[in-house]
UniProtKB/Swiss-Prot annotation:
Its main location: cytoplasm. Disulfide bonds: none annotated. GO terms for biological process: DNA replication; DNA synthesis involved in DNA repair; double-strand break repair; SOS response. One of its GO terms (molecular function) is single-stranded DNA binding. ATP binds at G30, E31, N32, A33, Q34, G35, K36, T37. Coiled coil: none annotated. It comes from the Bacteria. This is DNA replication and repair protein RecF. Belongs to the RecF family.
Length: 370
């Protein structure tokens, strides 16, 4: 798939912007604070209905405007699909093929993107929350069911934590409601973890040969989904639900004492190993960056396998963070396969056939020229 055109209205520093794109590498050159990253973010928000930079949607709306609008036309195997996202201070509304989607979980997935920005290099060495968010965002764009289950899990988790806090402060003494909420929570916790386990297995399958190639065959990358549950090699949903029920039963007194849920996918993590050693703790910066790059490139094939089409790749100021060898490997991997958007302050020193054949745009003060 690829984006054929993009229109921004009152988005960040863009009053109005209309762009046409080719199904190739599109390089956006400009100094810092001119609008390069805002443009990349707009494509990502159009796809994911949320920003990778902020959780405050009001920041996406141009100063003194009531709403921002992002429109695009995506070309897929089965035809052309117009999509639109309107961001107001009251919320977001998305349209696919001119039809308004009742829920954003139904909207997400109309266009698939992979964002690789400098902060993604923290995927390995950052906090577990960073990796959980990575899982949720990437699984969500290929599985609307996952987004639905995750949303319900988070809603019930919030209700359960609120009730535990009431039990802790003795504003409530009857634990019947806790039993009801726990039963509901275990079902959706198990569904979320099952999908995450499946995704991590698939990601490892695609990331291993990429990592091996970058490391010239010297390193083997393995991934492990870390959860408080005992997970068998072939997990079963009903067994996982039972396991959660047993876990919450054992933790009940401690949870009431602390006023918070102490188990579930909101506390899980993904661990990365190179040649059997934990990369986060023992890996060099080079190994950590190779791991992050391998994971991002693996997503290209994983999404293609899931939906039958390649996603759109967004490389936001990330080339400058990679050495020449990793730059070359990245550009070689995407060559001729995926529509790619690259932002950079300069292409000087980046000598690769992919960039030489790219469409070049220049941005200054929120205005683009080619």
């Amino acid at each position: 798939m690829y984006i054929q055109n993009l229109t921004l209205s009152s988005y960040r520093n863009y009053e109005r912007l209309d762009l046409q794109f080719e199904n190739k590498v599109n390089v956006i050159i400009g100094e810092n604070a001119q609008g390069k990253t805002n443009l990349m973010e707009a494509i990502y928000v159009l796809a994911m209905a949320k920003s990778h930079r902020t959780s405050n949607d009001k920041e996406l709306i141009r100063w003194d405007e009531d709403y921002a609008k992002i429109e695009g036309r995506v070309i897929k195997k089965n035809g052309s699909v117009p999509i639109q996202l309107v961001i107001s201070k009251k919320g977001k509304k998305g349209k696919v093929n001119h039809i308004e989607q009742q829920k954003l979980s139904q909207y997400v997935g109309a266009v698939n993107t992979i964002m690789f920005a400098p902060e993604d290099l923290n995927l390995v060495k950052g906090s577990p929350q960073v990796r959980r968010r990575f899982l949720d965002m990437e699984i969500g764009q290929v599985s609307p069911v996952y987004l639905h289950d995750l949303s319900l899990y988070q809603k019930i988790l919030s209700q359960r934590n609120h009730f535990l806090k009431q039990l802790q402060t003795r504003k409530q003494t009857d634990q019947t409601m806790l039993d009801v909420l726990t039963e509901q929570l275990t079902e959706f916790a198990a569904k979320v973890v099952m999908k995450r386990l499946q995704f991590v297995d698939q990601l490892e399958k695609w990331a291993q040969p990429i990592h091996s190639g970058i490391s010239r065959g010297l390193e083997e990358l393995t991934l492990k989904y870390h959860t408080s549950l005992h997970v068998s090699d072939s997990p079963d949903l009903s067994k996982m639900i039972n396991s959660y029920q047993e876990t919450f039963s054992k933790l009940r007194d401690k949870e009431i004492e602390r006023g918070v849920s102490l188990s579930g996918p909101h506390r899980d993590d993904v661990l990365f190993y190179v040649n059997g050693r934990d990369v986060q703790t023992y890996g060099s910066q080079g190994q950590q960056r190779t791991t992050a790059l391998s994971l991002k490139l693996a997503e290209i094939d994983l999404i293609q396998e899931e939906i039958g089409e390649y996603p759109i790749l967004l490389l936001d100021d990330v080339l400058s963070e990679l050495d020449d060898y990793r730059q070359s490997h990245l550009l070689h991997t995407i060559q001729g396969r995926v529509q790619t958007f690259v932002t950079t302050t300069s292409v000087d020193g980046i000598d690769h056939k992919t960039l030489n054949e790219a469409e070049i745009f220049r941005v200054e003060n929120g205005t683009l020229s080619d």
